[in-house]
Amino acid sequence: FKGLYGAALTEGDDITMALDMALDPEGYRLKAADGHCTIEGGSEVGVLYGVFALLRNLQTAGKAWAQFTADEEKAPSNRLRMLNHWDNMDGSIERGYSGDSFFFKDSEILIDVPRLTAYARMLASVGINGITINNVNVKDAASWLITDRYFGALQEYLKIFTPYGVKLYLSINFAAPMELGGMDSADPCDPAVAKWWAGKAQEGWAKLPGL
């Protein structure tokens, strides 16, 4: 609390966090008065959203902890609240105007744990629960994100983003059955192509739980 708000709780004050499965999985209930605060959530993510709500309300109220009061219960109205990055694996960003990617460089996945953790925390603080890390215009090395070549690094991303309630998504290459699978066609109406995609999806979900 001190690291986030700048002041420690005085003796006798407290913040209690608990699960209440009657709440929406991403919902929370926040109550605070007389130096005591309770945060309940429908899941650990719901509790996390409640913590961010507490910090947000503290900052906007402009009151000392002893005078701070809150009584709110909220849940997201939209199930998917997602950011779509157009990052390329060479480190460039299509239509990006503020620097290079911090996900990719030279066809490799960057694992900057402090920076990624700070980013995941920032996303959760405003209720973002999904992120696509690569450009929707998939080409070159990005086509291979759904293979063993990159599964290890993506597992590290899941370890970072999942605790903050942020689900990881990947943009895929329509021509992957041809480029990766050596098939003559990428026609989704072709049963062989559909079977290839089904197998690739199962492989991805098995090695990247939560993807």
Where are these regions (language model features)?
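Short, well-ordered secondary-structure micro-motifs within conserved domains or adaptor modules
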Residues: 6-26, 37-38
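Feature activates predominantly on carbohydrate-active enzymes
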Residues: 22-210
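Mature N-terminal segment immediately following signal peptide/propeptide cleavage
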Residues: 1-3
